[in-house]
Every structure is written in structure tokens, then in C-alpha cells.
């Protein structure tokens, strides 16, 4: 397997968030809601079920304070996730607030695309610099079978509109599944041949609620990787703030392929991201502990020093790697609550 070079950045990018294994954290994944309106068969096949007690998601002011603390400690990139973040009525205000935080250079959005065609112009105006949208199939019927929603054509129009208004690249996510996604690989490759899309195939991950689905549908991304390498695709360098994807390009394609393979050896070695849930808990790993509560330090601006101290101290408890390879997904029953 080819190794991926890491693209080094300047000294002004040095983060104060460094763990025991000398990994540097410049990337925050911020969930703003647990609610999702899709019923994806690999995540929430029965749809979102609200808890019996009313949950209060992070407010604008709380979001502002947590992002400011991370930025002060060297974070440069924030990804707004959910659930489906655009379902929040104040989503545009959230995006604007994050984008206006001193030190934040990229504000990315992960979305199911439900409102993309309608709102993409507003997202851009609010400060969203990068977009990841889920498209698990390019077949209308299959897309509805996977997601429970007949929205494929609208999402594809939203992607086209993003290019029209100046987005230079859109990342498209598809969960790699034996029955659904894998047979469409050629169709996805044809789609990105003349479009600046990074088509990202994400290995299905085992979670508490989806064990049987995982056993039936899991497919290693290595099989896709080997095929692409044989067809002339080449691995690209990674920047410090990039996500976990191994990215491949081909001289005959305008688009790229990204492979996210959490079961691969050393997957965690280049981890650069921390997660804050919509309820204000810091999660050191997607497949980890119950989270470290930050909310008691988000009510006043005067608590910033305490908040930053808690973040730095908590990071020292981050494990070297997850334990997915032995079937341990931690407390994660599904990925909707923390945005994957």
C-alpha cells in the first residue's frame, strides 16, 4: 500500500491542542442538532426518534463561545454537522457566526442535501466555504430505497448550482455497501469525469444498532483502492487540516475519489479532529466515551480561559486508536447524534 505524504504548513498553523501521541488538532466537527429527516438504511432506518425529555441544543451564543475557544487554541477549520444541520431555523446565523470567528479559515457543511437546491446561495452568503453532501446512489429508485426520500434530482440540481455560484469543488459522500453502492462504481466514475467532485466512499462502520446490516453489507475500501490504482489513479498528498480520506486523482478525470477506511491499520495515526455534540459534549473519538461536558463553561464570555484549559486537559485522555477492529464501537448506537 502506498503511503500518503503529509503536506506541511507554516508555523502560524501550529495548534495548542496536541495529545500524548503528538497529534495536532486543527479541525473541529461541531454538531448543531441530532434531528435528521432522512431514514437511511445504514444509520436511522426507522427515522429519528426524539428522546422522551426535551433536548436543548447549543444556542448561537454557546456555539460562538466554543468555536472561539477552539480558534484561540489553533483550530482553523470547523465542520457543521448534525443530524441534518440545515433543519435548524437559525442555521444561517450559526454559519455566519462560525465564519466570523477570528482564526477560522474554513467553514464546511455536511448535509443530506434536502435543502441544497433551495438554499445553496444563502449558505454561501452566510460563509460556508466547503460542502459535503450525501449521494448514496445515482439511481432515483435506489436513492429513495436507501434514504426514504425522493430527493435525488433536487440534490443533483443543488450540486450543479453550487458550481454555478463559484464553489470550485464539492465533496460527495456515499457509504460503501455491497448491495447498493459498490455495483454503481462505474456510474459514479462516469459522473465525476467532467465535474470537480471529490467522490468519497465511506466504509460502513459497525454500530450498536446496526450489527446485522453491517455483517451483510460491509465491503472493504481496499478492494476499490486496488482497482483504482490498477486503472492509473494516484494517491495525493494530505494537508494538515484535511479529513481522513485517502484521495486519488487521475489525469483523465476532473473529479477525484476519496476513500475513508476506518478499519485500516494506522487509520487513527493522522487524526486531527475533535467533536462537540449538539448538547455541548466534547468527544475525543467518534467511537469513544460518553463525552466531556463543556456546557457549564459556555454561559459567559468570562469563562473562556477555563474552557480552553478543560479542552487541553481533556485531550490528554484521547486514546491512540479506536477498537472497531474487535467490534467495539464504544457507546455509539448510530452516527446521527454526532455527525460521523
UniProtKB/Swiss-Prot annotation:
GO molecular function terms noted in the UniProt entry: 4 iron, 4 sulfur cluster binding; cyclic pyranopterin monophosphate synthase activity; GTP 3',8'-cyclase activity; GTP binding; metal ion binding; S-adenosyl-L-methionine binding
Residues that hold S-adenosyl-L-methionine according to the record: 42, 83, 134, 205
Pathway where this protein functions: Cofactor biosynthesis; molybdopterin biosynthesis
Binding site for [4Fe-4S] cluster 1: 36, 40, 43
Residues bound to [4Fe-4S] cluster 2: 268, 271, 285
Top-rank lineage group of the source organism: Bacteria
Catalytic activity: GTP + AH2 + S-adenosyl-L-methionine = (8S)-3',8-cyclo-7,8-dihydroguanosine 5'-triphosphate + 5'-deoxyadenosine + L-methionine + A + H(+)
Residue spans crossing the bilayer: none
Annotated residues for binding of GTP: 29, 79, 110, 171, 273-275
Family membership noted in the UniProt record: Belongs to the radical SAM superfamily. MoaA family.
Protein purpose: Catalyzes the cyclization of GTP to (8S)-3',8-cyclo-7,8-dihydroguanosine 5'-triphosphate.
HAMAP family: MoaA_B
Record text on subunit structure and interactions: Monomer and homodimer.
Name this protein carries in UniProt: GTP 3',8-cyclase
Gene source species: Actinobacillus pleuropneumoniae serotype 5b (strain L20)
Annotated gene: moaA
